[in-house]
């Protein structure tokens, strides 16, 4: 209707054609991502886990604010220079030899503490960890790094040990099978005691309140075991970058799993 009113006032054929081309091109530029977005949510499907029943609410919010969502999404993807959104969970496996080339041993520093000599992280994660560690230190908090990168083979040892100690079902709530661990990505860190009690420590409380400001996201939040596949882990954070943390908080109920699954499915989908 709006286009008809505009065109009715145009007398020059050349101007009419120019306006028509502009409208057509503008529409096509906008609709490619919109079509992709709608395809991901088509037929009652969701591009992330819906076990908690939150997907309809998240989907409704996104689809009612497509333009703003797509602007944020494209900003996050365009600034993902370090490939920080690789998915690793109980449904998505990493290859046995998967190891990013920039995984390097941790070096003693003044920003955080570690007591093992076999710890390593990807370079962007380690740099961000130093920044966060310094910020915590300024607040009188010392961050203790307890576990970082794990190879496929090392994770196999950890998982099999847990199965032997606690049984299959309990181990699957506590420990990732080889190829499904975020630790193999080289961007995940376990802090402190690696126990539930860590949440009540000064460091645990500081991380819960501030980690996202430095690009670190809690991977397994309380109440989302059905979504993540793992029980609450107050000590386990994954570096995804500050833009992605803000994106997760704004659009995905602050649940990392929802956002990572969405980005994975977005990247997999192509619209002809």
PLM region spans:
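Extracytoplasmic cell-surface/polysaccharide-interacting catalytic and binding patches
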Residues: 29-148, 152-272
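Sec-dependent N-terminal signal peptides of Gram-positive bacterial secreted proteins and lipoproteins
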Residues: 10-30
């Amino acid at each position: 209707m709006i286009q008809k009113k505009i065109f009715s006032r145009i007398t020059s054929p050349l101007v009419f054609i120019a306006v028509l081309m502009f409208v057509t091109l503008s529409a096509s530029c906008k609709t490619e991502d919109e079509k992709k977005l709608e395809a991901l949510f088509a037929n009652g499907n969701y591009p992330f886990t819906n076990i908690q029943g939150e997907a309809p609410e998240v989907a409704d919010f996104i689809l009612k604010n497509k333009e703003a969502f797509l602007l944020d999404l494209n900003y996050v993807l365009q600034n993902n220079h370090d490939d920080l959104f690789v998915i690793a969970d109980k449904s998505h496996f990493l290859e046995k030899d998967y190891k990013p080339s920039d995984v390097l041993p941790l070096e003693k520093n003044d920003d955080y503490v570690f007591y093992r000599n076999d710890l390593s992280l990807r370079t962007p994660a380690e740099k961000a960890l130093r920044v966060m560690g310094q910020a915590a230190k300024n607040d009188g908090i010392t961050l203790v790094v307890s576990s970082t990168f794990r190879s496929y083979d090392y994770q196999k040892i950890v998982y099999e040990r847990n199965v032997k100690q606690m049984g299959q079902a309990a181990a699957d709530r506590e420990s990732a099978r080889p190829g499904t661990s975020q630790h193999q990505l080289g961007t995940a860190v376990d802090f402190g005691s690696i126990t539930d009690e860590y949440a009540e420590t000064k460091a645990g409380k500081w991380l819960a309140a501030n980690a996202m400001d430095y690009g670190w996201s809690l991977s397994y939040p309380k109440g989302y075991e059905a979504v993540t596949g793992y029980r609450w882990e107050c000590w386990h954070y994954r570096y995804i970058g500050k833009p992605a943390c803000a994106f997760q908080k704004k659009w995905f109920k602050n649940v990392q799993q929802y956002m990572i699954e969405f980005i994975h499915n977005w990247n997999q989908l192509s619209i002809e």
